[in-house]
Amino acid sequence: MHILIDVQGYQSESKVRGIGRSTPAMSRAIIENAGEHRVSILINGMYPIDNINDVKMAYRDLLTDEDMFIFSAVAPTAYRHIENHGRSKAAQAARDIAIANIAPDIVYVISFFEGHSDSYTVSIPADNVPWKTVCVCHDLIPLLNKERYLGDPNFREFYMNKLAEFERADAIFAISQSAAQEVIEYTDIASDRVLNISSAVGEEFAVIDYSAERIQSLKDKYSLPDEFILSLAMIEPRKNIEALIHAYSLLPAELQQRYPMVLAYKVQPEQLERILRLAESYGLSRSQLIFTGFLTDDDLIALYNLCKLFVFPSLHEGFGLPPLEAMRCGAATLGSNITSLPEVIGWEDAMFNPHDVQDIRRVMEKALTDEAFYRELKAHALAQSAKFSWANTAHLAIEGFTRLLQSSQETDAGQAESVTASRLQMMQKIDALSEVDRLGLAWAVARNSFKRHTRKLLVDISVLAQHDAKTGIQRVSRSILSELLKSGVPGYEVSAVYYTPGECYRYANQYLSSHFPGEFGADEPVLFSKDDVLIATDLTAHLFPELVTQIDSMRAAGAFACFVVHDILPLRRPEWSIEGIQRDFPIWLSCLAEHADRLICVSASVAEDVKAWIAENRHWVKPNPLQTVSNFHLGADLDASVPSTGMPDNAQALLAAMAAAPSFIMVGTMEPRKGHAQTLAAFEELWREGKDYNLFIVGKQGWNVDSLCEKLRHHPQLNKKLFWLQNISDEFLAELYARSRALIFASQGEGFGLPLIEAAQKKLPVIIRDIPVFKEIAQEHAWYFSGEAPSDIAKAVEEWLALYEQNAHPRSENINWLTWKQSAEFLLKNLPIIAPAAKQ
């Protein structure tokens, strides 16, 4: 049996109410107790991405991403606005299409009567569908109190329409016998379709022994006295706060003085003023009523534990979570003797007539003055609350699902196709939809066709596709893309994509056609679907924050946004970067921290730096709670990086010069941090001392090195002992590596340092600065130097040569390095790739 649980009750405005508590608690219990049955959840993709993150966080310890389905539709759909009615109907159809493609046996809707004020979307089909719909009934309070709750014509229409749908449910699971009886008495639902599964509260509600410091902090935070009476509710007529205040005012003065009333209510200013005026009319001072405002769960649990008495005078509940929460925390609990509350409280002496303020006063006064009765209340609270558990509710629900399927005729799996066809026809007939709505729905329907899509692994080469500047980062992009295309990824179509500002992601098929064998078609827009993976290997800082919209959109469709982070040096040492990079990098990394699923760094050093930066900036960066930061190492085999070819005209002369004297090579774009100036000055010292050494600098001119480059162009040793080679091919670079005495890598900061690995692959010894990332990669297999004086490098070269002549120098060939194929494989291990065998 495959159970699909609609968890929108944890996304909507109900999130801060009882439904918001019971939705994750009940669904998690079903997952935990499902045994051999498969359980998935259905999430509404029209809510903000932070909302979706919260839902996924609530289940990530129990479900894989494969069992978290996000349905797409076009917002806004709130029924309260008549202009949304067409989109609302279309969203219901889109949800049906999503469910048909998920193909569950049971669709379990924990909260049904929603969608009037936000994008909550739920419906029960009137036609035959290949799944059974089971709805939870929390209460029918609006139906039983029409004058109070259904006075607004728009809401009345909405509620009555939902009620008509509700009556089509294959089964109703009520959270109390009282709620079940309401369904049987006041709807057309037969009693054999109604089951009481009860309810419960989380394990976090418990008796806790708080420290004196914690108690004092609560007192300070909420202006609490040493002892107090507690009540909890929303401000609405059925919660009966007026009667509670009236009854409290009738208590003897000494009890009022000793036990102020703490009202854990979230109130608007005008509501607060009205209640305080009411209290004053009963002779109460404002100091006798303490309003806490909204409470965190931790603080609420603490107040339950610390209160002298908890009182719940509600006129109508479907279940009544607050009394059960209070009793689980050991609080002496009193409540109304009507609707569902007798089932929860379970002791007649602890209840009162909520319509009779004298009766409320009587029971409160007895609890506060009769010590024996008070002790019984405390003991009863723990005994009674122990009868309720989410595990019991889950077992009852699963038994109900099983009986429902056993008593039903088997459905034709082919009906899923007919559901899609009929819903598409229905959408076409909705006149209220604009052309923009219809275009959005077309994308939504495509996204909701989960099973029809082969998963996609999409390599973002947004920079490379526009221009290959042949930087180290672009070598990474070329190499990773090449390996993934060559090797493939089981269960995924591998392709390249790019983003152009002001547009959307498109396939980089023209780039592929010009660089790889085969025909790839046109650069069509990308449809991101569930479980697709975007991996951005390029540095795209210049595209943020605009790209955030695309990232959130793909993630709301169930895809994953993953980014390779090469380094964050512009954040740590901004003086090493041009002004544009200094401006873009904080925006870029903060956006990645808040919106990406995975940050995959090119070294452990970079990963630690990224984590530290995010932690340091939490005052303005709000990290995605689902995000992981990991690392892999880059490859180094030039032959597999789609190398450039060709030899310069003076190749033989250069190679001859290299062979004529000990030659040292530096590789990389010339930038202030790379250490070229210090290295050149070091060799000038050595040349002045008469040392016959060559220095080969391989790399084009970068940012803020104009004076250095001018010096190189006019250096007296240029093309004698000093050689500056720009824009050479990978083929010729390999020749230089093979003939050099050692690589000098003097950079003050790197994310990884490909030249180090490329040198190791050629068994070329390395002389490097002792920065963390180099130590991570080279370990003891390199000769290290520190300091920023020319003499520091000159000394290191001399010391290394002495060791070299004794054949005692560190051996770079012992450095562990990866091929690009291996690097791509390690990258895949850091991605949310689903093995084909796991696909349902």
Swiss-Prot record:
Region annotated Alpha-(1->2)-mannosyltransferase, chain positions: 2-399
Membrane topology, as annotated: Peripheral membrane protein
Gene3D superfamilies per record: Glycogen Phosphorylase B (3.40.50.2000)
Pathway: Bacterial outer membrane biogenesis; LPS O-antigen biosynthesis
EC numbers: 2.4.1.371
Catalytic activity, reaction form: [alpha-D-Man-(1->3)-alpha-D-Man-(1->3)-alpha-D-Man-(1->2)-alpha-D-Man-(1->2)](n)-alpha-D-Man-(1->3)-alpha-D-Man-(1->3)-alpha-D-Man-(1->3)-alpha-D-GlcNAc-di-trans,octa-cis-undecaprenyl diphosphate + 2 GDP-alpha-D-mannose = alpha-D-Man-(1->2)-alpha-D-Man-(1->2)-[alpha-D-Man-(1->3)-alpha-D-Man-(1->3)-alpha-D-Man-(1->2)-alpha-D-Man-(1->2)](n)-alpha-D-Man-(1->3)-alpha-D-Man-(1->3)-alpha-D-Man-(1->3)-alpha-D-GlcNAc-di-trans,octa-cis-undecaprenyl diphosphate + 2 GDP + 2 H(+); alpha-D-Man-(1->2)-alpha-D-Man-(1->2)-[alpha-D-Man-(1->3)-alpha-D-Man-(1->3)-alpha-D-Man-(1->2)-alpha-D-Man-(1->2)](n)-alpha-D-Man-(1->3)-alpha-D-Man-(1->3)-alpha-D-Man-(1->3)-alpha-D-GlcNAc-di-trans,octa-cis-undecaprenyl diphosphate + 2 GDP-alpha-D-mannose = [alpha-D-Man-(1->3)-alpha-D-Man-(1->3)-alpha-D-Man-(1->2)-alpha-D-Man-(1->2)](n+1)-alpha-D-Man-(1->3)-alpha-D-Man-(1->3)-alpha-D-Man-(1->3)-alpha-D-GlcNAc-di-trans,octa-cis-undecaprenyl diphosphate + 2 GDP + 2 H(+)
GO CC list: plasma membrane
Mechanisms controlling activity: The alpha-(1->2)-mannosyltransferase activity of the N-terminal domain is regulated by the activity of the C-terminal alpha-(1->3)-mannosyltransferase. The relative concentration of WbdA and WbdD is critical in determining the O polysaccharide (OPS) modal chain length. OPS chain length increases with increasing concentration of WbdA, but the maximum length does not increase beyond the wild-type modal length, despite substantial increases in WbdA concentration.
Highest taxon, organism lineage: Bacteria
Compartments it resides in: Cell inner membrane
Keywords from the UniProt entry: Cell inner membrane, Cell membrane, Glycosyltransferase, Lipopolysaccharide biosynthesis, Membrane, Repeat, Transferase
A GO molecular-function annotation: glycosyltransferase activity
Primary enzyme class: transferase
UniProt GO BP: O antigen biosynthetic process
Membrane spanning stretches: none
Subunit structure: Monomer. Interacts with the C-terminal region of WbdD. Interacts with WbdD via a surface-exposed alpha-helix in the C-terminal mannosyltransferase domain. However, the C-terminal domain is unable to interact with WbdD in the absence of its N-terminal partner.
Domain notes: Contains two separable and functional domains. In vitro, the purified N-terminal domain possesses alpha-(1->2)-mannosyltransferase activity, and transfers multiple mannose residues to a synthetic acceptor to create alpha-(1->2)-linked polymannose. The C-terminal domain shows alpha-(1->3)-mannosyltransferase activity.
UniProt function note: Mannosyltransferase involved in the biosynthesis of the repeat unit of the lipopolysaccharide (LPS) O-antigen region. Catalyzes the polymerization of a tetrasaccharide repeat unit containing two alpha-(1->3)- and two alpha-(1->2)-linked mannopyranose residues. Extension is terminated by the action of the chain terminator bifunctional methyltransferase/kinase WbdD.
Note: This enzyme is specific for the E.coli serotype O9a O-antigen.
Family statement: Belongs to the glycosyltransferase group 1 family. Glycosyltransferase 4 subfamily.
Protein name (database record): Serotype-specific mannosyltransferase WbdA
Organism of origin: Escherichia coli
Primary gene name: wbdA
